[in-house]
Amino acid sequence: MVEKEEAVISEEEAAQYDRQIRLWGLEAQKRLRTSRVLLVGMRGLGAEVAKNLILAGVKALTLLDHEQVSSEDSRAQFLIPSGSLGQNRAEASLNRARNLNPMVSVEADTENINQKSDDFFTQFDVVCLTSCPSDLLVRVNHICHKHNIKFFTGDVYGYHGSMFADLGEHEFVEEKAKVTKAKPLVEDGPEAKKAKIDPTETILVKKKVQFCPLKDALEIDWRSEKAKSALKKTPTDYFLLQVLMKFRTDKGRDPQPSSYQEDSELLLQICSDVLDSLGVSPDLLPKDFASYCFSEMAPVCAVVGGVLGQEIVKALSLRDAPHNNFFFFDGKTSNGIVDCLGSK
C-alpha cells in the first residue's frame, strides 16, 4: 500500500466538496483526496464506478483496459463518445471522465492486466476489477490481501449484478446518536425510566471487521454440515455468479445477444455442471435463468456501480460499516442483498 501524504484541502476544494464534507466530515474527505485507485474494465459498470469515484474526489484514478470499443459498449458505457468504435476503451473514456471533475487526476492504461507485475498494484490504495475472469480476480486479490490494499470486484450480467469486497482487517468509525443518562435529581421520577437519545448530538465509535479472500468465498464446501445449514439463507445469485464466471472462463467472453440460442443452451449445461460440482441441488436456479443474463443493462449498472462506488468511498474514508463481503442485485425484483460468505 502506498505511503499517505499529509492531506490539505484548499479553499477551492472545500467549496467543490462542501456537500460531501457536511455528509461524512472533513477528515474523511482529506483521506479521499490522498487516495489512488486502480479501476480495471471500462464497460458499463466500470463507467459508473469511475463517475462515482471522480465526483467523490479521490486524488487519482487509473482506468485500465486493453480492449477496443465494440458496438456492445453503446448499451451502457456513457463515457465513450459515439464514433469511437475500434478505439481503446480506457483512452476513449478519458476525456469525459476528466471533465467530470478537473481536480481529480485521471489516466488511461492500455496494457493487458495479465502482463502487470505484482509490484504494479502496490502503488494504489484500492484496486477494483470489473468484467474479469475468476482466475485473474483470485490472483489480484491475493496480491492485494498480501499488501493490505483494499480489493473490490463487480459484474453485471443482464438483470443481475454483484460486487465483492476484501478489505483485510478493516478499521472504521460509525457515527452514533449520544445517549444521555437521567440526572440524579430525577432518578426516582418517571424520566429515570427513559433513555434519552439526542439525534443532534453524536459520537464516533471505532470498530474493526475482518474480511476473507475471494478464493475462500468462491470455494465453499457446500457438502459440509455448516454450509448445508446456511444454504437456505444463501442468495441464489451467488450460484448464478459461479455459473456466469465459469462461462466467462470457458468462452473468454460473456453471453451475447448475437449468439443467444447457443449461449442459452451452454449456460444451462454449465449450470448443471457447476451446481453438481458444488454439491447443491440442480433445481437451485430457475430453468429460465439464462433469459435474464445477456448484456450489461444500464439501470443495473447504475445500481451496482452506485453501491460499488459507495463501498470504495467508505473503505477509503474509514467511515461507516462496509458491506462484508458480497452484494447481489436482482433487477427483475429490484431487490439487493448483502451476505457474508466464506468467512471462518
From Swiss-Prot:
A GO cellular-component term linked to this record: SUMO activating enzyme complex
The pathway it acts in is: Protein modification; protein sumoylation
Q: Where in the cell is it found?
A: Nucleus
Pfam families noted in UniProt: ThiF (PF00899)
- Classify the source by domain of life: Eukaryota
Keyword vocabulary terms for this entry = Ligase, Nucleus, Ubl conjugation pathway
Q: Any idea what job this protein has? A: The heterodimer acts as an E1 ligase for sumo1, sumo2, and sumo3. It mediates ATP-dependent activation of sumo proteins followed by formation of a thioester bond between a sumo protein and a conserved active site cysteine residue on uba2/sae2.
Name this polypeptide is given: SUMO-activating enzyme subunit 1
Q: Which organism is it from?
A: Xenopus laevis (African clawed frog)
